[in-house]
Amino acid sequence: MSSSPRLVLIDGNNQMYRAYHAIRDLTGPDGRSTNAVYGFITMLRKLISDHQPERMAAAFDLRGPTFRNQLDDEYKANRRPMPEDLVEQIEGVHEACRALGVPIVTHQGFEADDVIGTLATRAAATGLDVVIVTGDKDFFQLVNDRIRVFNPRNDGTWYEADRV
């Protein structure tokens, strides 16, 4: 990758789920779960500190059907719903992003993956280097000389054009 300006795109749902499952039974004084919020903040602060990106955004899914549901009634039909104690933490994760200066991007009718894919390819086409922060291997199809994937799990793994 060159020394071009860099855009970091966070797969918000993926990293929120990761935090939720990595830290169990963490609650606030009111008894409500805070594990996903705490884990997401920790990941985000480390990401900012370690990589000092020039531009950043976090993409999240919105509730409701997407264009894929219109194409296939069975799309994600067997997927379990998001746990209620995680649903209750979504706004806290969004607040953390805003507090740390990370814009949230969403688009009704599209998944966060679609938003990230669009932003990454458009940014790369304008000369920006792009880093997608996710544990989702589906993003490997986007990897090229301008787009890399970073999985922050453990000490972090980089996926570049010569490694996917």
Show which residues each predicted segment covers.
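Noncatalytic, basic helical substrate-engagement surface that gates or grips nucleic-acid strands
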Residues: S2-V133, K137-E160
